[in-house]
C-alpha cells in the first residue's frame, strides 16, 4: 500500500467511496433484521459520509446521471426518522425515567407505547426504501463504477499538492454562519439555524476526516473539536425534539402534567447551551479560521516534502541497484 504522501487525489477518493459502499452493503441485512438499533445508526452514518465524499471530490469523478445522490438522500431521510425515534426512546428509558416519580412514569406509558408504534412504522418505511429497485440499482451501478472508475485529469495529481483545496468549500461558509454568535436561545428560528449549523459542522468534520492520512496534530485536533460541537448541538436538538413530541402526546401541558420531567429537560438544555457557548466563543473567530487554514497549509507542505524525499530515495535506490548490476555483470 502506498504511503499517504504518495497518494493521488483519485487514490484517496476511490478508497473512501469503496469503503463506504462496502459498509452500506454490510449493514443492509442487520438493519432489515432490526435486532439492535446500532446497525441502523451506522448505516445512516455511512450514507452521510458517502454523500459528503461524492460532493467533496466531485471534481475528480466522472459519474453518470443515475449515480446522483438522490437515492442516498431519500434513504437517509427514511433511516433518520427511525433513528430519531430510537434516540428519543433510549433517552426516556435510560436517562429520564429512572429519575422520575412513579406518577410521572405511569403518565408516560401511553407516550412510550405511541413512540414504539411510530418507530415500528418508521422502520417499515426504511426497509421498504432499502429494498427499492432505485436504491439497490444505485448500489449496483456504483459497484460497477468502482471496478472501472472514470476520473478527470485532476484525479491523477498528487493529493499532497491539493490538500487545502479539498476543505476550502466548507471553510468559506462555516465560520460566518450567524448561529455561532447567538447569545441566547429563544426563538424557533434560532433553533432552526443552530440545527443548520450542526449539519455544516458535521460536513466539515467528515471532509477533514476524509483527508486524515495527511493531517497533522493541529488539524486532527480540529476534527475532535468539531465532533464535540456536533454532539452538543445534537444533544440540544434531541432535547427540543423530545419536548415537542411530549407536548403533542400529552393531554395537557408538559410543565403541568410532568413537572419533574420538564425540569430535567430544561436543566439538560441549559447545560448543553452553556457548554456550546463556551466552545462557540473560542471557535467563531477569524483567528480560529486562520489557524485551521494555516494548519492545512502546513500539512500540505509537510506531505509534499515527504513525497519529494521518498521519490529521491526511490531514484537513488534504482541508480545504486543499476550500478551494482553493472559491477556484477560478467565481462
Question: Which ranges hold each PLM region?
Answer:
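Cationic, histidine-enriched alpha-helical/coil surfaces that engage anionic ligands
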Residues: 1-331
